[in-house]
Swiss-Prot record:
Domain Histidine kinase: 153-347
Modified positions (Phosphohistidine) in chain numbering: 159
Organism: Staphylococcus carnosus (strain TM300)
Activity regulation remarks: Activated by cysteine desulfurase, Fe(2+) ions and cysteine and inhibited by oxygen and ADP.
Function: Member of the two-component regulatory system NreB/NreC involved in the control of dissimilatory nitrate/nitrite reduction in response to oxygen. NreB functions as a direct oxygen sensor histidine kinase which is autophosphorylated, in the absence of oxygen, probably at the conserved histidine residue, and transfers its phosphate group probably to a conserved aspartate residue of NreC. NreB/NreC activates the expression of the nitrate (narGHJI) and nitrite (nir) reductase operons, as well as the putative nitrate transporter gene narT.
Cited Pfam families: HATPase_c (PF02518), HisKA_3 (PF07730)
Named cofactor requirement(s): [4Fe-4S] cluster
Enzyme class: transferase
Protein name: Oxygen sensor histidine kinase NreB
Length: 347
């Protein structure tokens, strides 16, 4: 009698759970016909209470589930699997208001004799939204930190370089009015002209580092050719540049990421590789932009984290993630370093 009482109590609890839970519960037979569904599930699947018209209702609403093939895939459908797993998985369901929502789902055979399956859905949208907000805050903090570091670098460049040169020009100009000798006056004037010429170059270089106008006006290939020419002039390192690009243009954010990652990799080669030649390859295929910066320098161990400008060598991957790209770094001691950026492109 006690076991019957416990069974009745359990049955009552399960019934209350079925009726009152926010978890969407659907029971189907082996042909995909809906046998029953709770009120929570009716929000997604039922246009009316006529279950006989709801054969394949799950399939009609399902936009795919996350598997080894893709984030949203119908391949090897869980509804048709020969072996039903006991674990949960992520599935994407189109709701009545035509929105695609992610759910944590389970699909299990609960009655072997009658071939009854239970399909349950738990809404994970709030958790995903919280995770997205946390990720956005984290990325904002990193962006602000990178901006502040860049501002500090520019401030040092201005103070230690350009401002000091301007002070020298100011002093030289003040001294000119006291000079009587014509030849000396000419020599000093030429020296001031030289200082001013260097100042113009410094300002131009700083401007290019901040945001080259050629990148906005002409695209990646033209911007890189101009930058590499200036890089060689300023630092004495020859850049062997290979590309199959011509005049293709891409989303502004993609072009910026490719330009900055290559720029960062070049500066790291300049500072740490101890080489006088760097290879840069920029290739476009059907689905990706692939940028590669390689040197035959001193290299480093994978556990090391050499410092660089801006985001740093390993921080480049975070910038690449903004456009769904990846950065791979391959380095060996005394054999050099290869930095490869891959960015997917869409029409």
């Amino acid at each position: 009698m006690k076991s019957i009482s416990n069974r009745d109590k359990l049955q009552d609890l399960l019934t209350q759970y079925y009726l009152n839970t926010n978890e969407k519960m659907v029971f189907l037979n082996s042909t995909g016909e809906v046998i029953a569904l709770n009120e929570a599930a009716e929000e997604v699947f039922a246009d009316d209470n006529d279950y006989s018209q709801m054969t394949n209702a799950v399939c009609r609403r399902c936009e795919g589930y996350s598997n080894e093939y893709d984030i949203m895939s119908c391949e090897n459908c869980f509804l048709e699997a020969l072996e039903i797993g006991k674990g949960s998985f992520q599935v994407f369901i189109r709701t009545k208001d035509n929105k695609i929502q992610p759910y944590t789902a389970s699909y299990e055979l609960i009655d072997h004799e009658k071939g009854i399956y239970a399909f349950t859905l738990h809404n994970v949208s709030p958790q995903i939204q919280r995770q997205e907000r946390m990720y956005q805050r984290k990325m904002m903090q990193k962006t602000i930190s990178a901006q502040e570091n860049e501002r500090k670098r520019i401030s040092r460049e201005l103070h230690d370089g350009i401002v000091q040169e301007l002070i020298n020009v100011d002093v030289e100009l003040r001294l000119l009015k006291y000079q009587q000798d014509k030849d000396e006056l000419i020599d000093n004037s030429k020296r001031i002209e030289g200082i001013m010429s260097r100042l113009i170059d410094d300002v131009r270089n700083l401007s290019v580092e901040l945001r080259p106008s050629s990148l906005d006006d002409l695209g990646l290939d033209a911007a890189f050719r101009s930058y590499f020419k200036q890089f060689e002039k300023n630092y004495g390192i020859h850049v062997n540049y290979h590309t199959n690009f011509s005049a293709q243009r891409f989303d502004n954010e993609i072009e910026t990421v490719v330009y900055r990652v290559v720029q960062e990799a070049l500066f790291n080669a300049l500072k740490y590789a101890q080489v006088d030649i760097v290879e840069v390859s920029l290739q476009l295929n059907e689905n990706n932009i692939i940028a590669e910066v390689s040197d035959r320098g001193v290299g480093f161990k994978r556990g090391d984290d050499p410092k660089g400008t801006g985001l740093g060598l390993f921080g480049m991957n975070e910038r690449a993630e903004l456009v769904n790209g990846t950065v791979n770094i391959d380095s060996q001691i005394n054999r050099g370093t290869i930095v490869t950026l891959e960015v997917p492109i869409t029409d």
